[in-house]
Amino acid sequence: MTTLSFELPDGSTVEVDVRRLLNAGYAGRDQTEVQAHIDELAELGVPGPEVTPALYPVAPYLAAQTDAVPAQHGRTSGEAEWALVITGNGPDDVLLTVACDHTDRALEVHGVAWSKNANLDVLGRQAWRLTDVAGHLDQIALLGRVGAEQTVIQRATLAALLTPAYWLEVLRGRGEASAGTVLLSGTIAMIEGVDQFSDRWEAELIDPVLNRSIRCAYSVEQLPDPIG
């Protein structure tokens, strides 16, 4: 079982055994824009979901706090996201951190759920209690960067995505709002003209109200060609 460890702003550490990992998809707050994105993907051969927003169960062992992600080929890339981590039963037991959902784009055209289970979900090593940021979530910025030059490929505030409160209600309805559940938010649009197929990805949450940030970063290391 994967165990994640998070440092909180007060210096304390919280550990959680990951029992359930879920990746939200097509989770923009403006579902009209989401549908336009689905139509664009369909032209590229990526099958659309039957309903939006979507929610994809992912093998819990794919949740990782790591500096390197192995990839089978050169057509994989990250997605900057936030993540909810439930550590207990109380309101202060829901943590918010940054995450990067590394996705197999070659497999994605055959099935989004398959692509989500082909690579790691990388999470930050720090977290904030959701109760501490709930009042200004929409002001928190989410950025994705690629390459050694840290070129910005994704930039928005959390106002672009469905809220943690929305997803907590979904989890309660599914009986999954319990310790060990980790949910990634779904991502924001990529900036046109920036190559997503990079050997380095990072994601960052920036809180301008409390003047702090959380970051995760990793190299993408392509596996050797198979024999046989």
Put a short name on every predicted segment:
Residues 1-182, 189-228:
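Catalytic-core "active-site belt" of small-molecule-metabolizing enzymes
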